[in-house]
Structures are given as C-alpha cells and as structure tokens.
C-alpha cells in the first residue's frame, strides 16, 4: 500500500502547475467579461487594475468561456513543456565522462549491524552485517569475500585475525593457516570463548556468580608436522556411492600419476574405475577400523598381474569374485569388472600409476594421520567450532589432503543443512582460505560457492593476485569472483590485478585547464577550460598506494578508500599472543587435554591403575592392581 500512495502523491505533485494555470486563467477570463473599454487593450488594463477582484471567490468560475479558456491554457502549457522536454538535450553536469566517486559513511551505513560483533570487519570504518536476511532485502549481500594483497600487505593481520576476534555467538570458523602461526596467536582466545548468553541476550552466570563461558571447540589438521595434528580419515565421511565418486575425483584432480600416460584420458578413467571399485569394497565390506587409506594401499599392493598369464587371479580378484557370487550388482563389483577388461600389460600400467599417485601414503606418519577421524567435519555447522588447517607455503606435497578435506567439508555441510536443518545451518560457517592458491583445486568449487550462501556458509578467498585464481580454475575463475559480493584490495603490483581493479573503480569527470602561448609578430595568450575523464585510481596510483590504505568494493555501493583495520583497537586484542607471548596456544597440550577414552559397552579390557612410588613395582607384575572393567 505504501508504494501506491507514494506514486499517487507524486502524480498529484506533477499536475499542480497545470491546475494553477487553469485556475488563474479561468478567474481572469471571468473578470475580463465585466471589464469595460473601447479596445481589447483598454479592457486588459482595467483587468490588471482590478486583478484582486477575480480571486474574491475561491471557487473557479463555472461559465463556459471561463472553463474553456482555463483548459486551453493548461493544455497549451503542458504541450510546450512536453515537446521541449522530448526534444531537449540531456545534460549531466559534472558527470560527462563518468560519475565514479569514493563511498562515504552514508553509503555503508545500511549494511552495518548495530551489534559490533555481528559484523565482518573489512576496513577501519566499513563493516558488513552477518545477518543474511536484513529487514530491507535490497541491502542483502552474500558473505563471500575476495581478498587480494601482495606478500607483506597484511592479509592475515588486517583481515583473518579481525574476523576471529569477533567471535559471534552463532559462527564457526574454518581457517587455512600457512606456517601454523594463526592458531598459535589466536587459539587461546578461541579456546576461552565468549560469555554465554540466554535467549534474551543476557549473560549467564554459575552458582558462584562467575560468568559462564562458551568456548570454541578447536580442531587442527597439520600437514607440516603430523605430530601436532588431529586425525582425519576421508573414508569416515563416505555415506553413499555418490561420496565415493566425489572422493575419487578429488584424489585424481590433486595428485599426479606416473609418466606421460597418466595424463591421458584413458589412463585416468581406468584409474578412476579401480579406485571406485576398491574404495567401494572397503566402505561396504571392511570393518570400520580398516576403512582408511592404509587398506586401500594394501589392496593395490595385492593386485598382482602377470602379462604372460591372463588367467592368473590375485587375492583381490578372489575377494571380488566372492562378493560377486553374493551380490552380482554390487557397486564395487560393477566397477571392478570394467577395470578387469584391461589386458595384463595395461592393468600393470594402471597399477603403477595408482601406486605413484598414492605414493605419499607410503609415509607411515600420513597413514597414521588418516587411520581414523577426530575432525567431525559434518558437525561444524551444529556447534561452535574453529578448525585450523595448517599447510606449508613452500611445499605442496600434502596439499591434496587439504583439498580432499575442503571438498568433503562443503558437501557435508550442504547435505546436513538440507537433510537435517531444513536448508540452513544453526551456526554460520565462515571459511577463511588464506593462501587459497596453495590449497589445490577443490572440484566444482565454482558451483559450490554459488550455492553455499543459502545454507549459512561463506568463503573468504585470500590471494596474492587474481591471476592465481585463473591459473588453478581457468575459465571458472570469473564465476568464482562473480559470486563474491565483496572485494578487498590490500595492495600489490601484479599488472593484471591492477588493471582489473582500476577498470572496475570507473572514471570520474575532472576539470581540465589549458594555457597557450603563441609567439610570432604578435604574441598571444590563451586560456581554455574543459572537462575530461580520469580513472578514479589509475594503475600506477594503485601500485604506489599507501601501505595503511585499502580499497573495498561492495556490490551495488560506491567503492571505499579507507584505512586497514587496526587490530590493536579491538577489545579482544589483549587476548592474542601479538599482545603478550603468554597468550600463545600450545596445540599438543590442548590435544592431550581433549583426549577421550571411547568405551565399547560390549568390550572387556584390563585397566591398570598406578600411584606414585608403586609404578616400578606394578611394572614388574602385570596382574597386580588390575581391575576387570565391562
């Protein structure tokens, strides 16, 4: 109803001038009939002298001549205005060559949440609300962010850390941590958490009056030092044959086979068949404790082939034959039969390529890391969690493990949102992908980033230059950037990035002042003022941008040229190790503290209990001090 009323009021306002013309001419025509004079000029002079008499009565005259004269005058004025406007020139003074300008406080105000913690911190003065459904839908923006900054521009300090320091009540974090410094500097703050609140937003206290805290559950995958990592088993998250195909695809995309043949289409398809068959068998037939990469390696090692004996059957062949007798249409059997169509020599080449692709799992530490699972990836959207993924910024040997985790994470969270939570996770999951180019390729990421918004998932893609994204995702890079409503540029000098940013900032119109000095027989001077267009910020200006400044572009809003966020002004800065080394987070101690003994109700085992000086005595006699626990 409000828009209709507003439109009607606007129409009335536009018609007012013509109503006034009709009224004035109507009243003057009525008075003119009573004016005496020998000529028209005399009568008009009398009319002007007695002009106020026409308006003694407010209502217009209803005589025919007065009505006709008023109507003709109003229509005539309307026609003049209409045709003049239709044929008139369109001027946009000050915007002849472009209307670009920097945004201000008024431009960003509708996008900021009044509760400071419920915002994404972008610059010192600009923030974006975490609320995905604001009161006015026109201010809704997705929370996907592209952060671009060269080495040393402060991507971690000015963007990643401020997000973690916010610690909103209903947000979980997944953080890529190059070198493993972020968890050390911010982990203690997250493990402490924030005051727990009730439904009304009131802080809860225990019986002693102390504030009840809501800590983050810390998870760590460390591909630099496996001893500081929790266990991650990709097999644990297989729920169906569809998940098997996704896992195999991730392995194939992020690892390399052996020799020239491994890159050919036939060989990769053959490898995929074997992986699907073996992983399918392990998932459906192997006990839970054997569902891991170690078992997969054992299967490949046992898949012996003999070129001279096509009838030879290895141990794996016998297992699949037995399974085929019981379930002829089993997924693993169907895949394995296709693989077995290859001749002995071809099968041997396939096995060599598979072995080379999984060569990193020959390392005992990696097999141990993937032997069972502690990550609970599917529960990150159900509980307050901070998952740190530590990767090396110099060696990408184990980055395929990280790519596997991210691929499974996105799919698991989307499936859980749809199947359990009616399309929206209770905790918004913010994925902060620092050094995104080092992670590897996440399959179908261009499609995932377009659909995760509605499930309460967002991704911050942090790069050194836009060309890094194009190198990995090729043509899909533009789709990925197009699905990020926010772009934050912290500085850099890569030419392609500077060119694209300069173009998207647009052009402004500036005044140009020229002088001329002509010398000849008679000397003359000239001054010339004109307008021209100039980039809001040219490539060379972007390249020498102040180190404390950044550029923020939010969809549908003018760009902002602002100071980078100063973390020392944040109220939780004192909880970081940046402020005090005592706040450093020790991962090993936390992992020991979090260890839980999981008991099987039907399993019996011996529990040995030792106390102080009795330790040496107890070690010499196994049966003393033993309790039988059920």
Where are these regions (language model features)?
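N-terminal pre-Walker A segment at the start of P-loop NTPase domains
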Residues: 105-136
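Canonical alpha-helical transmembrane segments of integral membrane proteins
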Residues: 11-27
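Juxtamembrane/interface segments at transmembrane-helix termini
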Residues: 24-35, 78-99
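P-loop NTPase motor domains
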Residues: 22, 89, 136-457, 472, ...
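Membrane-interfacial helical/loop segments at transmembrane boundaries in membrane proteins
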Residues: 24-60
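Alpha-helical membrane-embedded segments
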Residues: 63-87
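Conserved ATP-driven motor cores of ASCE-family P-loop NTPases powering translocation/secretion/packaging/pilus
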Residues: 449-551
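Single conserved hydrophobic/aromatic residue that forms the stacking wall/gate
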Residues: 2-9, 13
């Amino acid at each position: 109803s409000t828009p209709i009323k507003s439109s009607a009021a606007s129409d009335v306002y536009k018609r007012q001038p013509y109503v006034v013309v009709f009224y004035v001419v109507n009243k003057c025509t009525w008075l003119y009939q009573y004016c005496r004079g020998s000529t028209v000029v005399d009568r008009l002079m009398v009319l002007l002298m007695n002009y106020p008499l026409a308006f003694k009565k407010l209502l217009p005259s209803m005589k025919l001549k007065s009505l006709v004269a008023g109507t003709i005058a109003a229509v005539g004025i309307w026609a003049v205005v209409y045709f003049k406007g239709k044929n008139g020139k369109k001027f946009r003074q000050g915007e002849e060559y472009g209307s670009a300008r920097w945004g201000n406080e008024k431009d960003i105000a509708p996008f900021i949440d009044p509760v400071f913690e419920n915002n994404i911190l972008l610059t010192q003065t600009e923030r974006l609300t975490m609320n995905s459904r604001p009161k006015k839908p026109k201010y809704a923006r997705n929370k996907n962010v592209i952060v671009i900054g060269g080495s040393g521009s402060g991507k971690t300090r000015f963007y990643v850390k401020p997000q973690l320091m916010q610690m909103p009540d209903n947000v979980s974090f997944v953080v890529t941590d190059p070198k493993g410094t972020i968890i050390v500097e911010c982990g203690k703050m997250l493990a402490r958490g924030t005051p727990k609140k009730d439904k009304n937003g009131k802080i809860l206290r225990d019986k002693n009056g102390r504030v009840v805290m809501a800590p983050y559950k810390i998870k760590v995958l460390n591909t630099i030092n496996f001893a500081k990592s929790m266990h991650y088993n990709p097999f644990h998250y297989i729920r169906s044959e569809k998940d098997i195909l996704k896992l195999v695809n991730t392995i194939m995309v992020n690892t390399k086979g052996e020799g020239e043949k491994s890159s050919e289409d036939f060989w990769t398809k053959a490898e995929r068949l074997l992986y699907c068959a073996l992983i399918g068998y392990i998932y459906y037939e192997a006990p839970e404790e054997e569902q891991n990469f170690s078992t997969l390696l054992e299967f490949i090692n046992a898949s012996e082939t003999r070129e001279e004996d096509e009838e030879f059957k290895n141990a794996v062949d016998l297992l699949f034959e037995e399974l085929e007798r019981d379930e002829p249409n089993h997924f693993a059997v169907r895949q394995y039969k296709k693989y077995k169509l290859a001749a002995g020599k071809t099968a041997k080449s396939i096995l060599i390529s598979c072995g080379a692709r999984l060569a990193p799992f020959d390392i005992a530490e990696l097999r141990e890391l993937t032997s069972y699972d502690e990550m609970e990836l599917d529960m990150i959207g159900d509980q307050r969690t901070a998952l740190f993924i530590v990767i090396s910024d110099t060696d990408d040997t184990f980055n395929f493990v990280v790519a596997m985790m991210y691929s499974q994470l996105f799919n698991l969270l989307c499936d859980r949102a749809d199947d359990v939570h009616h399309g929206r996770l209770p905790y918004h999951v913010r994925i902060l992908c620092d050094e995104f180019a080092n992670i590897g390729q996440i399959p179908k990421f261009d499609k995932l980033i377009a659909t995760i918004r509605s499930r309460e998932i967002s991704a911050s893609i942090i790069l050194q230059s836009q060309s890094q994204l194009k190198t990995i995702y090729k043509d899909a890079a533009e789709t990925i950037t197009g699905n990020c409503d926010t772009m934050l540029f912290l500085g850099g000098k890569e030419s392609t990035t500077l060119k694209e940013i300069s173009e998207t900032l647009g052009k402004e119109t500036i005044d140009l002042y020229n002088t001329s000095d002509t010398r000849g027989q008679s000397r003359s001077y000239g001054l010339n003022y004109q307008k021209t267009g100039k980039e809001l910020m040219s490539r060379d200006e972007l390249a020498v941008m102040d180190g404390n400044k950044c550029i923020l572009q939010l969809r549908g809003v003018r760009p902002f040229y602002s100071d980078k966020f100063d973390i020392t002004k944040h109220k939780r800065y004192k909880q970081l190790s940046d402020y005090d080394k005592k706040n450093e987070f020790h991962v090993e101690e936390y992992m020991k503290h979090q260890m839980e003994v999981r008991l099987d109700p039907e399993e019996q085992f011996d529990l040995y209990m030792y106390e102080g000086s009795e330790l040496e005595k107890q070690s010499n006699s196994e049966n003393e001090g033993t309790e039988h626990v059920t």
